[in-house]
Design a protein with these regions (language model features):
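Sigma70-family region 2
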Residues: 3-4, 43-61, 81-83
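A short, charge-rich alpha-helical start-of-domain segment used by transcription regulators
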Residues: 1-23, 33-39, 47, 51
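A short pre-motif secondary-structure segment
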Residues: 132-136
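Structural recognition of an alpha-helix C-terminal capping motif at a helix-to-coil junction
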Residues: 37-44, 48, 61-73
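Helix-turn-helix DNA-binding motif, specifically the short coil turn and the N-cap/start of the second
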Residues: 31, 142, 151-156
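Acidic, proline/glycine-rich intrinsically disordered inter-domain spacer in sigma factors
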Residues: 95-123
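C-terminal edge and immediately downstream basic/flexible tail or linker adjoining helix-turn-helix-like DNA-binding
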Residues: 1-4, 8-10, 86-93, 144, ...
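Arg/Lys-rich amphipathic alpha helix in sigma70-family domain 2
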Residues: 51-54, 68-90, 103, 111
């Protein structure tokens, strides 16, 4: 394959998944800037390894899973190097970047409802569970694609999703105590 053909195929098959790659990196690193660095590094790695990619135009999800595997591995390497940085990312920041598209009014309302509560619940999940939920619920990967991307058996993916969802359900259904400052208007 010529360099021009490699670049063309890469742009057609891999580049459309840039937003998904960025979203996954954002959830893992908890920082927009670090996610950008991770994605840049992952795309360089993907381009270097692209000749070994065996996907085709008929199976674009395979390209997404292949790329997200690289992004995940790059993110994990970043995480090992920067574990003590303490970076945090707000839930609203972890959603699709508003520069990518304009949400409709219904979507704005849904996103704003209980945003902080959901963010806090997701933050409490162990990385393995959070990663599985992000790949499934936000990026739309199948169980098999998650299995390939994360490098664990299909049963482990199913278990992580089930346990992660149960954990989220428990966190979100626990009654919250009012902070005295928050309850000031309820006399």
């Amino acid at each position: 394959m010529t360099p021009q053909e490699k670049l063309r195929r890469f742009e057609e098959q891999i580049s459309p998944h840039l937003k998904s790659a960025y979203n996954l990196a954002k959830w893992v690193t908890r920082s927009r800037e670090d996610a950008e660095d991770v994605v840049q590094d992952a795309f360089l790695r993907a381009f270097s390894a692209f000749e070994s990619y065996r996907g085709d135009d008929a199976h674009p999800q395979n390209a997404k899973a292949w790329l997200l595997t690289i992004v995940r591995n790059t993110s994990m390497t970043w995480l090992k190097r920067n574990r003590n940085s303490g970076a945090t990312l707000g839930f609203e920041e972890a959603l699709d970047d508003p520069r990518d598209r304009s949400p409709d009014p219904e979507e704005i309302l849904l996103i704003s409802c209980d945003r902080e509560e959901v963010r806090q619940a997701l933050e409490q999940l162990p990385l393995d569970f959070r990663e599985a939920i992000v790949l499934r619920e936000m990026e739309g990967l199948s169980y098999r694609e998650i299995s390939a991307a994360v490098g664990v058996p299909l049963g482990t993916v199913m278990s992580r999703l089930s346990r992660g969802r149960d954990w989220l359900r428990r966190i979100l259904s626990t009654p919250k105590r009012l902070n005295p400052k928050e309850g000031a208007g309820l006399r």
